[in-house]
Amino acid sequence: MGRVTFIGAGPGSADLITLRGAKLLAQAQVVLFDALTDPALREYAPLARWVDVGKRGFGHATSQPAINALLVHEAQLSEHVVRLKGGDPSVLGRLEEELQALATHGIAYDVVPGVTAALAAAAHTARPLTRRGHGRSVSLTTAMTQLGVLQATRTADTEVFYMAGRQLGALASKLMQAGWPADTAALVVSRAGWPDARVSEHEVGQLADAETLHAGRPAVVTVGAGAMPAVQTGDKPSPDDPRP
């Protein structure tokens, strides 16, 4: 019986993985990886067997029960299995179900955190998610329910919505229904954490204007305090400028 390590690969480029994550990935015999992880991560574990268990929105996807079963199967055959997840395993990553599957079969596990897309978007645009005095709370929300219904909330000073890129116009309507004024600041970042990240600034009422720019790209939408510029001077760098 082996051990499973869940590793957050970060939301984009391979160098966003943590040092601990890279070290443990290098020790893997088998790697079950998500669709949005950087192929360059294979360089950390070139001798491991890599198994694609990715989910792709509106395309081919490995079912969650199939992933759970495969994870258990591989852990029963190998000493060290890595479950490589995009972003952070604990944020909208179905981690609970996979942990439960392992626990049911008495398989040991540990979890290594990673950078989630909301944080990568905040870093890329230099827009902190929390602000002193007017941005004291943050909510990370999937815009799609388990039944595929679009939802929006107003429960925090900054709301970050995942998986909303295909329905920005509808999200705008839901946000205003939830109590966000139409002129509230909103920020859309697609492929956050990658060199080709795209950024657009809007008011909530005009979010539909971003659909063409971000079409076909995984995007996060930040609304409220964390969407506003942190620097108000006219010489601040563009959000699209390369950043280390």
What is the predicted role of each segment?
Residues 11, 36-38, 54-61, 115-117, ...:
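Short, acidic/turn-prone active-site loops that include or flank metal/cofactor-
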Residues 2-4, 76-81, 94, 137, ...:
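A contiguous loop/helix-start segment that scaffolds small-molecule binding in enzyme catalytic cores
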Residues 88-156, 198-201:
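Class I SAM-dependent methyltransferase SAM-binding "motif I" and its flanking Rossmann-like core
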